[in-house]
Design a protein with these regions (language model features):
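N-terminal glycine-rich phosphate/pyrophosphate-binding loop and immediately adjacent elements
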Residues: 1-106
Length: 106
């Protein structure tokens, strides 16, 4: 069976992999030059920008996709825990570090 998945964000890639694991011939369509959807990262004027959420809060879902193909994710990706997830720099040059830990951010 042939399947088309539109969008290569986390959801699109996961859907394409699940279909492929079930024997479908999958075509993945993405309008941007890079995969990742809102999780992609791009550079502009010397700065690096997140296209959207890039913090992985449920790594077990990634592991599940690798298991479909009997692959060990450790052979392909490295997930590194970060103390600070994001640093926001405001116009007045003040900074706010977001870590996901309410006590740490007080």
């Amino acid at each position: 069976m042939n399947s088309i998945v539109i969008g290569s964000g986390f959801g699109g890639i996961a859907a394409a992999l699940r279909l492929k694991a079930k024997g479908h011939k999958v075509t993945l369509i993405e309008k941007h030059p890079d995969l990742g959807g809102r999780a992609r990262v791009f550079k502009k004027n010397g700065f690096i920008y997140d296209g959207g959420p890039t913090v992985i809060t449920a790594p077990y879902l990634i592991n599940e996709l690798f298991e479909l193909f009997k692959k060990d994710p450790k052979n392909y990706i490295v997930l590194t825990p970060l103390k600070v997830w994001y640093q926001f720099i405001f116009e007045d040059k003040t900074k706010f570090n977001y870590s996901g830990d309410e006590q740490e951010m007080k």
